[in-house]
Each structure stands twice: as C-alpha cells, then as structure tokens.
Amino acid sequence: MSREQHHPDPGAEPAAKPGPSTAASPQEATATGLGPWPGEDPLEAARIIRGELGSPHLPFLAELPDRGVGSDALGRTAALLEELAVDVQPYGWRLVDRPGKEMRRAASALSTDLNVLADVAGAEDLSATDLKVQLVGPLSLAAGLHLHNGERALLDHGARRDLAASLAAGVGGYLRRVAAAVPGTRLVVQVDEPDIAAVLAGTIPTASGYRTLRAGAASEARESLRLVLEALRAAGAAEVVLSFPEIEAPIELALAAGADGVALPLKALTNRQWEQLAGAVEAGKQFWAGVLDVSSGRPLPKVADCVDSVWRPWHQLGLPASLLGSIRVTPSAGLAGQTPAQATEVLGRLTQVADGLNQLALG
C-alpha cells in the first residue's frame, strides 16, 4: 500500500484541507459503541454500557429502536428540530405543521432516557468523565423525512436548507439537557450520515421508486454539515465525529466540514481511503475504526485479528505506532440486532482490542 499516489476526494475543495483538530487527541486507543442497543429497558442498557466502557473508554447514550416508533434514530433526531414538526405516515416520517403523536412519543422516550442516565450516573462511585450521544446528520435527515406530498425532503432545496438550520438550532437545547443529566461530563457527539454517499451520488430513490433524486452538490453538503457541527461545538460538544458506511465514504468532505474525525467500518476500506485516513490522523484528526464485524452472525473475531486489521495497513502506510492513540475502536454497526448478552460481549471484546493497540503503541 503506497501513499505516493493520492487523489483528492471530489467532494472537497482544494483550499479546505483538514487542519489540526480542535479536540484533544486521546492519549491511548479506546473503545465505544455506535448507539443502537437491544431491548427496551434504558436502565439495563445504561448500566451495562457504563459498566463495560469505564474510563478511559467512551460510554454512550443508548438508542433502543425495539421500543418502536420514536426510538428509531430518525425519529429521535426529528424530535430535536426547532420550529419544524413531524408525524408518521405509512411511508415514514413526514414534515407537518403541528407535531404528531409520534413526535411527542419520541420526545418522551428521550426524556425518559436522560432521566435514567442521570440516576445511573448519580449512583456511580466513580462516574465516567466522557459521554457520547448520537444524532442523524442533515443530509440523511433530508433523505429520510418526507414532504406533505410524500416526496423526500431531499428533493426540495428550501426544505434541505430549513432542515439543516432547524437541526442546528435544536441541538443546543439537547446538549444542555444531556449536560444537566451528567454534570461535569465531557460530551462527544457522533453525527450519523448513513445516506451521505447515496445523496452525493444521486442514488436515493424518489417516493415512487421509479427514479432517483438528483445528486447533491458537495459544496451544499459540506456547508450543511458545517452549520450543524459548529452549532454542536457552540453548545459545548468537545468532539464531533461523522459516522458513515465505508462504501464511497466522503472522508475528506467530512473533515473539510470541520469534523474532528470520522467513524467507519474497516471491512471494505480501499487503499485510497486508508491513505486519506492516514493524512487525517497525521493532521490531528481521529479515526473511529469499526474493527468488530457484527453483521455476519458468526462468532466474534479474535482480538489479535482485530488488532491486525488496524495495524497491518497502519504499518504499511508508514504511520508510527505512537499515533494509535488517535483511534477509537467500534463495532461495524449498531448492536440492536444482538441479544443484550451478545452486545455486552461485543463491548468487552472492543476494550480488549483497544488494549492490544495500546500495547503496540508502547512498543
């Protein structure tokens, strides 16, 4: 794997190369999850996650989609929107003039989760210093929400603009509520953009399914992301990381928008993507590596194999072991499809992988 043949991402302007991160780089490799968690019990989820991901690792506020409508990632984020409302139709979440019962249900579920988090954290002898929360980013939000006529909001320039602005306005209140639940905790935000590559490529289907929507402009995508990321930082986020699938992942666009790092699975990363990640790490950015494949249903990979999946390309690119502290290891996807016992095992395995990377870093 060579780093001499580097081709810039077409979504990023030449003048907007990643600069030094504003967030402090971790001193050692750590572990976290991506948010989705099995079951319907926020108390059990919080206890397990905070128990398995104690310091220096990164516990997270669980998303529990098994509870139904409003606890899914899209509905949870839609409930944060300022001066915009949603309801649910047979084809999905729809923008409306007044909040529907599903939006109220989403807001209620989030309030419950924050109250439970406050209780669990308050009962700990030694509370975690960091906490991660997740939300859907403006591009995937526009792809997932529908207009009054049933078409995707992504189709309409004004709707895209209003959604990004509404989300940016709403995240401040959300982070203040999280901070009140866990006073003194350093907040990390994971912005999920599962549809970003499809938005940029023009492969999102219309409501009818017979056509696809026009490819989104990279410049507009970058500015929408920048607006939300800046709002998160202004609201107190210490780190903001963009998470997306690895296929056609717009790594340089994400960093040009101001992200402190990117989170993506390792399984299908190309040489070019590894080169982009190497440049980002050297510039002080973080890489959240989806080292643990949880999509196959097979037994979890061995710790040594997971460590090697990072170290081999890392070493081939000439990156020093000392920079392994810029890595957080994650599963390849959310854990909602696992059993609670399996999900717990995944978190334990991830902390072991982080330990293995730290041993390499120490030489």
Where are these regions (language model features)?
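Active-site loop segments of alpha/beta catalytic cores
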Residues: 166, 170-269
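Alpha/beta catalytic barrel-like cores
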Residues: 1-136, 140-155, 253-260, 285, ...
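A solvent-exposed, charged loop/short amphipathic helix patch at secondary-structure junctions
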Residues: 146-161, 204-216
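Catalytic-face loop-and-helix region of soluble metabolic enzyme cores
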Residues: 260-363
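Active-site-proximal loop/turn and secondary-structure-junction residues that shape catalytic pockets
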Residues: 137-139, 193-195, 246-248, 268, ...
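Structured alpha-helical segments in the cores of large, soluble enzyme domains
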Residues: 117-120, 174-178, 221-232, 276-278, ...
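Active-site groove signature of glycoside hydrolases
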Residues: 132-137, 181-192, 325-330
